[in-house]
């Protein structure tokens, strides 16, 4: 298992530098994109974490991936990625990206939420749901949507550790439990 405290140190340092430059959101987006590219390609992951490859080979791969990201990457992120190559810490990249995003959200007063519905939600319904969740949590809520036909209907929203479940599937399960108890 990856030592999260190491990833946290790199994420915090990158956040501090990105915040000073006023580029936190851009760095977060680019770091997530970079980590996603690496995570989705097993060969890239192997090159970046396998000790059989030299630092120079890893650095060339990292530089190539940075160039492949649309719009390039911020200088602070590029320097951090080069440092990770130099220190053989690229195995922590996914955790660094996740922790960076979480810390940036916390610093900005945001919280991420996941909305699951049986069918795609219209934009106005999603906006209304987001506004309701913001009122409940007293924070700016960023929603990610997902479709799960097994819900049958309704919506399930998780914000932080709190689950708001208004799905028909859950309501049917509750009715089944109540009927069994009688």
Curated annotation (Swiss-Prot):
GO molecular-function term, one example from the UniProt record: proton-transporting ATP synthase activity, rotational mechanism
Membrane disposition: Peripheral membrane protein
GO cellular component: plasma membrane; proton-transporting ATP synthase complex
Keywords: ATP synthesis, Cell inner membrane, Cell membrane, CF(1), Hydrogen ion transport, Ion transport, Membrane, Transport
Subcellular locations according to the entry: Cell inner membrane
Keyword Transferase: no
Entries under InterPro entries matching the protein: ATP_synth_OSCP/delta_N_sf, ATPase_OSCP/dsu
Keyword Ion transport included in the entry's annotation: yes
Function per UniProt: F(1)F(0) ATP synthase produces ATP from ADP in the presence of a proton or sodium gradient. F-type ATPases consist of two structural domains, F(1) containing the extramembraneous catalytic core and F(0) containing the membrane proton channel, linked together by a central stalk and a peripheral stalk. During catalysis, ATP synthesis in the catalytic domain of F(1) is coupled via a rotary mechanism of the central stalk subunits to proton translocation.
Record note on quaternary structure: F-type ATPases have 2 components, F(1) - the catalytic core - and F(0) - the membrane proton channel. F(1) has five subunits: alpha(3), beta(3), gamma(1), delta(1), epsilon(1). F(0) has three main subunits: a(1), b(2) and c(10-14). The alpha and beta chains form an alternating ring which encloses part of the gamma chain. F(1) is attached to F(0) by a central stalk formed by the gamma and epsilon chains, while a peripheral stalk is formed by the delta and b chains.
PANTHER family: ATP SYNTHASE DELTA CHAIN
Family designation: Belongs to the ATPase delta chain family.
Name used for this protein in its record: ATP synthase subunit delta
Species of provenance: Myxococcus xanthus (strain DK1622)
Name of the encoding gene: atpH
